[in-house]
Amino acid sequence: MMSKHIFQKEPVLSIATCLAIISAFFVPPDAEYLGYIDFRTLAILFSLMTVMAGLRGQGVFDRLGHALLSHTRTTLQLTAVLVGLCFFSSMLITNDVSLLTFVPFTFVVLNSLNASVRSKLLLPIVCMQTIAANLGSMLTPLGNPQNLYLYGKSGMDMSAFVLLMLPYSIISLVLIAIWAVWLCREGSAIVVTHSAVNSEPDKKLIALYGILFVACLLVVLRVLPYGVAFAAILVCAFFADRPTLGRVDYSLILTFVALFIFIGNLGRIEAFSGWLQNVLAGHEVFVSVLASQVTSNVPAAILLSGFTDNFRALIIGTNLGGLGTLIASMASLISYRQIANEVPAEKGHYFAMFTISNVVFLAILMGAWAMT
């Protein structure tokens, strides 16, 4: 019964752990296992999640949302703010944190509107917030876990990474803008009422996390050793804001560890290694998009990176592959759970809307890739 509960709560971690254990029967544990683990990626991931949890705990992102909403007067402006927050913020705070913050915020804001406007906007906005967070996050190495991993693995510099994904980000932004105008084609004036964030933020903590975020950026840019930033963030959080350490997504870190072990073992099984290298050769984008649909894009990135050096193609493929099925990007489940909890009668409608919208966006972006 407990194992079923764990699987339902953490399906990706559960599957990754099972795969790691099964692979250990074919490649018994030895000293080489330690070499599988990318400690730099894990340290940066922990550091970023801790800093984001700290800033979120201080209501920084909620206050940003409230400030922007104070200028909205129409449904189009409201939609642009709520969806734009997810698109642009995900570039720096990750798609997960963006959705964890702004989807609940959206429920609060829309609840202040009349029932007809709320019912018209709720599902489309949450659906597009999810797509926007996934697509906005693809522009930077900080945007999502697979980017962070592949950026470190590839040895690319920041500018090369951004330039690689910039065309897809621009196309995505244009598509989202067109969608917003279409949704609000019968736009009407609205009055948004929303309660201010109650608790006063700790300005010293916000300043501290701001400094620590800069440290994270310096690590990503390979200016600062990851061990220094990791130690500083761990010590600062432990002594200055200990509850934040409890809000870190440790299951994601453990998922990475399990996948590192699984991929490391597969690489030592010659028959499988040779087969996958042949499948990938020249088809990295297409294969990574397909793999993301069934495993989600983080496991797909880690799996495929062990069998090709074409990291540019993997970066494109796993980012575009975050579109499509509900599990293509695990961040998408955050929004789905919010819908299922808040308006359970609408979750089927949301799922259909989400799937159709994702397939359309994926088809257009894959078409753009095919023309490059």
Give names to the regions the model predicted.
Residues 117-184, 190-194, 336-365:
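Membrane-core helix-loop-helix motifs of multi-pass transport proteins
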Residues 9-14, 39-40, 66-79, 121-131, ...:
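Cytoplasmic-side transmembrane-helix entry/capping segments in multi-pass membrane proteins
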Residues 39-41, 70-83, 113-125, 203-207, ...:
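Membrane-interfacial loop-to-helix junctions in multi-pass transporters
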Residues 2, 66, 183-210, 239-246:
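Flexible interhelical linker loops that connect adjacent transmembrane helices
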Residues 88-138, 302-315, 344-349, 358, ...:
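Hydrophobic transmembrane alpha-helices that form the pore/transport pathway of multi-pass ion
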Residues 162-173, 286-372:
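C-terminal transmembrane helix pair
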Residues 3-9, 31-41, 156-168, 198-203, ...:
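Interfacial loop-to-helix junctions that mark the boundaries of transmembrane helices
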Residues 36, 58, 62-65, 211-309:
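Transmembrane helical segments that form the transport core of multi-pass membrane transport proteins
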